[in-house]
Curated annotation (Swiss-Prot):
It is an enzyme of class 6 (ligase). The gene is proS. InterPro entries: aa-tRNA-synt_IIb, aa-tRNA-synth_II, aa-tRNA-synth_II/BPL/LPL, Anticodon-bd, Anticodon-bd_dom_sf, Pro-tRNA-ligase_IIa, Pro-tRNA-synth_IIa_bac-type, Pro-tRNA-Synthase_IIa_type1. Its main location: cytoplasm. It catalyses: tRNA(Pro) + L-proline + ATP = L-prolyl-tRNA(Pro) + AMP + diphosphate. Disulfide bonds: none annotated. It comes from the Bacteria. It comes from Burkholderia multivorans (strain ATCC 17616 / 249). This is Proline--tRNA ligase.
Amino acid sequence: MKASRFFIGTLKEAPADAEIVSHKLMVRAGMIRRVAGGIYNYLPIGLRSIRKVEAIVREEMNRAGAVELLMPAVQPAELWQESGRWEQYGPELLRFKDRKDNDFVIGPTHEEVVTDIARNQIKSYRQMPVNFYQIQTKFRDEIRPRFGVMRGREFIMKDAYSFDKDAEGLRESYRKMYDAYVRIFTRLGLEFRAVAADSGSIGGNFSHEFHVIADTGEDAIAYCPSSEFAANVEAAEALPLIAERAAPAEALTKVATPGKAKCEAVAELLNIPLERTIKSIVLATDNEGAEPTIWLVMLRGDHDLNEIKVSKLPGLKNHRFATEQEIVEWFGTPPGYLGPIGTKKPVKVIADRTVANMSDFVVGANEVDYHIAGVNWGRDLPEPEVADVRNVKKGDPSPDGKGAIDICRGIEVGHVFQLGTKYSEAMGATFLDESGKPQPMLMGCYGIGVTRILGAAIEQNFDDKGIIWPESIAPFEVVLCPMGYDRSDAVREAADKLYAELTAAGIDVILDDRGERPGVMFADWELIGVPHRLVIGERGLKDGKIEYQGRRDTEATLLPAGEAAATVAEKVRAALAH
């Protein structure tokens, strides 16, 4: 490719609405341009990187035995009504009517459509396993699209759906996709972690997220540096921090805590560690035709509630936070001084695992400006229902017993789910088993955010000059910068020769023949993030040298002119082989 025949739309300044590095750099590098909120044009530079991501994804999906198809972006409402997601999905699902007043959606995912394919095409266990995938544009009507392609409304996604006859087959399909994802993100040149996750609105009973590690990531990941353990903080098991409950050493005492409604303030006033205080959180579950059930969840003062874990407890699937009116009715006091002793009406108490092993702790007295110290289970309170209801923290013991938890930030770029029969039972997707009996198909679904990968890769790979692409997804692998291409025959001939040699070697190279000043050329290609640069100048050619600089290098080096193409081609191949 020659730059004079390409489109390079670099900008010196980022738009005012760009908040994060990837959004700023994708606009400045001429990769994207905004059309509407969360909707972008992908300019030639950006599209080249997208196509490279798609190629790697497609190769690894095919290698794993998946079969490519293409499903419509527009889907009839009837399919979503069958699955139950027409009512469940919410305003993110873009709905519209055609001229005949039929309801349709623009698909954010394709579980319903692919299940419809399967129920009409798969009749026997002999036709499974099968895994269909596509790479297609999706639409999710985000309430607040932001961060460029990281949280857009329209995006490109690879979504795959496996169908198996039994649980063993589903586990094998899931393993193949998990392994394929590891290969994909490794080939993309990204630092990533696969983490155990909650299945969210897709549903199902087992899932992993793939996160690109970046300080700007929206998701918190708990991992163990000395083992393979990693999980979304929402899903990570929090072990009890106290192995055994100590015997009571203090008497039950009501203490004045005027104006101290927070655990930190109470601990400071009483001159005790925050870890001896209890955070009381009041939840409610509604009962048709009767008053709600009120729950008191007890956490250690330095811990935070994990609502996803709570929602999985018996009776708490549809919980909500209690209103202040309900709190006063059940506890006799507003929030800030709540506790399990002396409630006005019965409440159900759940203690976090760590709280269940505490002794001589402090709780609210259910009276403004008072707490109770020296509280102990068994003596002052009945033994509680115990559950893991908190988020893990840095330093907690790893659930695999191999060290301590650390926390990092990640950007989710892939997700794999074992759906089981969630959609096949709802939509009647059955097959005849070996004995001729109809059985529901077992499904898995597997997504990769193709356009999101670009933003995530930039968040992980940039400096003050611009993007630093991994070779595998860079719009070009090598850029040739000739000094005076339009003025010097020697420079032009050397640049054209290098271009021909690199092209023949299969290297994705661009020759900057625009006639720009060196400073402009260098700034453009550093901003765009091409991994390798060769500078051809008359002075160097007289000495038989060509200047080379890798995008991550701080200094340039001189290469023999006759060896420059082979040397750089080998650098590219070595990087792609990692």
